[in-house]
Amino acid sequence: MQSYIKNFESSWFAAVMGTGVLAVTSLFYSEYLPILKDISFLLFYFNILLFFVFLMLWILRWVKYPKNMIAELKHPVLSSFSPTVAVAMLVLGIDFILIKNNLFLGKIFWVFGAIGMFLFSLIVPFYMFKSESIKLDHVNPGWYIPPVGLIVIPIAGSLIMPHLTGVWHELTVLINYFGWGAGFFLYLALLAVVIYRFILHHPLPSAMAPTVWINLGPIGAGIVALINMVNNSPFITIKEPFYIFSFIFWGFGLWWSLMAIIMTLYYVKKLKLPYAMSWWAFIFPLGVYIASTHLVYKIFGFEIVDYIGFGLYWLLFFFWIVTLIKTINKVYSGELFKDKIN
C-alpha cells in the first residue's frame, strides 16, 4: 500500500476528467441512442467513486511524502499534470449540473476546483519560469493542461451565473472571464512553443505520443466555455460574432483531430505505442471537443457537424474502454507504482 501512496501521481485525475466528459457526451448523444443516457448515469457514479479514491491517495501522499509532491510540482513534465486534481473537480461540477441537475453540489465542486485551478495556474508556471534546467526535450502538449484548466472554469461557472445575485454574481462573472481570458492567451503562447518543438526537434518519445491529443483540450473547452458565457451574460447583446468565432475555432479543432489520428497511427506503426498513463490524454481532450461539436450544431443547425461529433464519440468510447482495461491490468501488476521521483 505504501508504494501505491508514494508513487500516486496527480496525472491519475486525468482518468476522472476523461470519464466525466464521456458521461456528458453520452448524455448529449442519447438523442440518437437513448441507452446512452443510462450509460451516462453509470459513468457518472463510477467517476464519483474514482475521484474520492484518488483524492484519498493524493492527500495521503501529501501527508506521507511531501517531498515527492513538491518534486512533482518542480518537474518540467510532470508539473503540468498537477492541476488535473482541480480540473477533475471542475468536470465533476459540470457533471452534477448537467447529468444530475444538482446545482448545489455542482457549485461546491466548482468553487473548490476554481480555487485549486487558480493556485496551480500560478504555481506551475512560476517553477517553470525560474527553472534553469528546462530543455526542448521537455516541451510537450501536456504543458497545455494549466491553460485548459483555466478555460474549463467558465464551463460550469457560466451555468451557475444566472442563479446568483449581487456581489456573488459579479464575482462569478469575474472568475469566469478571468479563467477564459488567461487560459486562452496562455494556450496561444504555448501553442507556438509546442509547434516549434514539433517542427524543429525530434518526435515525442512514445510514452508521450498520446499527448498530441491534448491540443484538442483548449480548443474544445474554449468553445464550450465561450458559448456558455455568451449565452449566460445578459450584458452581451450581440452574440453572433462569438458564435461565428466558435465555429471557426471548431474548424481548427477538426484539423487537429485529423492530425492527432495521423500522428497516433504513425507512432503505432513506426515507434510502437506502449501503454502509459499518458493514454488518458486520448480521452478528455477528444471528449470536450466532441461536446463543443454538439454545441456548435445546436447553434447553427448543421447536421453534418453533429454526425462528425457522433462518429468521434464512438472513437472516444473505444479509447476509454481500451485505456481503462490497460490501466486496470497495469495496476494489478504493480507496474504503475514503481519509483519515478526520488
From Swiss-Prot:
GO terms for cellular component: plasma membrane. The chain crosses the membrane at residues 8-28, 39-59, 79-99, 108-128, 142-162, 175-195, 207-227, 242-262, 276-296, 304-324. Belongs to the tellurite-resistance/dicarboxylate transporter (TDT) family. Keywords: Cell membrane, Membrane, Transmembrane, Transmembrane helix, Transport. One of its GO terms (molecular function) is sulfite transmembrane transporter activity. NCBIfam families: tdt. It holds the Pfam family SLAC1. It comes from Methanocaldococcus jannaschii (strain ATCC 43067 / DSM 2661 / JAL-1 / JCM 10045 / NBRC 100440) (Methanococcus jannaschii). It is found in: Cell membrane. The keyword Cell membrane applies. Its main location: membrane. It is a multi-pass membrane protein. This is Uncharacterized transporter MJ0762. Gene3D superfamilies: Voltage-dependent anion channel.
